[in-house]
Regions:
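N-terminal entry/capping and adjacent linker segments that precede and initiate structured domains
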Residues: 1-389
Length: 389
């Protein structure tokens, strides 16, 4: 291999799954440096998005390890750990972040996760779950005279043209809500900067409990709003740092019980009519209401259970569409047979959070300047060891 031109080596490696690529780092310094090569990182990410087999699902669950003390567990499944057809097995990601046993995933972008501290109510880390690398985010804006926020929503996005990543937080304060203003304050962090920027009030409030952006499409993050008279999809253009409105589909039932997702790079919406059916829509031309197209409809009577809230997770192998059903199960729709079925996952917890993820070599450390804290956790048979940078 070392006799091949570097360009050919990079081309070969760019087509490999993320797990064997990360293992290469343990071989020698040459392979460690090669997996940090910017050309390989870019080519591998490009190949991963082209290949549907590169899709994985990251699961987060909380395990009771002591009285009143929970620890967060990260696991994943992909096309390579199917036991037989629809039977999958959780693979644990044996990583530990410093001083942070309990966290939530509030964004996945280009192989990186944005991790949120639910106790402090702040975004805490940018983390690559397959390489173990992380970077600590600077503390967000919190007025010293104000009590802690009531709620915080997060978005994590990327500018392709400039290779810039941004985190946005929408912060709700009880005092403002009490005074009749339910709109959150918007703060933006460009990764590489040492401080957040206050860009003013968002024009809409979001659905209560909607912490994470549900879709990153066309350079914009998307949430749902339930302000009186404004049942709409709220967008945030990551480049322009401007809020906007995207029209939702004209659902067959007229009821708005929907969740957003991304299917083949397009905004999608899954809606359900209580106890009767669920329908999936895709926006073929971004921002154009008439381009919403219904992909399929599934009746509860045909599948034998009440479907309820579902959220599109993405296309799996053979064009199947995976859906999150509530917070405890996965469904798969097969467009060839027009059938919906449940997915069995060995070792799955009773409840979990799940995000669609494409494994990458993108390093959180490369996105930050000097003066911030970096780390790398390397798992092995003897446990987990931290390397500081």
């Amino acid at each position: 291999m070392d006799k091949l031109p570097r360009e050919i080596i990079i081309n070969i490696l760019s087509r490999l799954p993320i797990k064997p690529l990360v293992r290469c780092r343990c071989l020698c310094k040459f392979w460690l440096n090669l997996t940090h090569d910017s050309q390989l990182i870019t080519m591998h990410l490009h190949q991963s998005f082209k290949n549907e087999d590169s899709l994985s699902l990251i699961f987060l669950s909380n395990i009771l390890v002591a009285p009143n003390h929970f620890q967060t567990r990260l696991s994943f499944i992909d096309n390579n750990n199917s036991n037989n057809g629809d039977h999958y097995t959780f693979v644990d990601l044996n990583v530990t972040l410093p001083h942070f046993d309990n966290f939530e995933i509030l964004g996945s972008c280009n192989g990186l996760l944005c991790l949120f501290d639910p106790l402090a109510k702040i975004p805490r880390y940018i983390f690559n779950p397959f390489s173990g690398e992380y970077a600590t985010l600077p503390n967000p804006i919190r007025p010293s005279s104000s009590p802690p926020p009531r709620d915080v929503a997060i978005g994590f996005g990327y500018l392709l043209e400039s290779n810039v990543y941004k985190v946005i937080e929408l912060v709700y304060y009880s005092s403002a809500i009490f005074n009749g203003d339910s709109r959150p304050e918007a703060h933006v962090l460009t990764l590489g900067d040492c401080s957040w920027r206050n860009i003013g009030k968002a024009p809409f409030s979001l659905i209560r409990g909607s912490k994470a952006s549900q879709a990153f499409v066309n350079g914009a993050l998307h949430w749902l709003s339930d302000m009186p008279g404004f049942d709409c999809i709220v967008s945030f253009d990551v480049g322009e740092e401007q809020f906007g409105v995207v029209p939702h589909p004209e659902f067959e039932s007229g009821q708005l019980n929907y969740r957003l997702g991304v299917l083949r790079g397009r905004l999608s919406a899954a809606n359900y009519n209580y106890g009767e059916y669920a329908e999936m829509w895709v926006m073929n031309e971004y921002g154009v209401k008439s381009s919403w197209t219904k992909c399929f409809k599934v009746n509860c009577s045909e599948v034998g259970f009440n479907i309820g809230y579902v959220r599109p997770l993405g296309r799996w192998r053979s064009g199947e569409v995976w859906l999150l059903h509530g917070s405890s199960s996965l469904l798969c729709y097969d467009p060839r047979t027009k059938s919906l079925r449940k997915i069995s996952i060995a070792g799955s917890p009773h409840a979990f959070q799940v995000v669609t993820h494409v494994g990458s070599l993108v390093s959180p450390q490369s996105l930050f300047g000097e003066g911030l804290h970096f780390g790398l956790f390397v798992g092995g048979d003897e446990g987990v060891h931290q390397l500081e940078f």
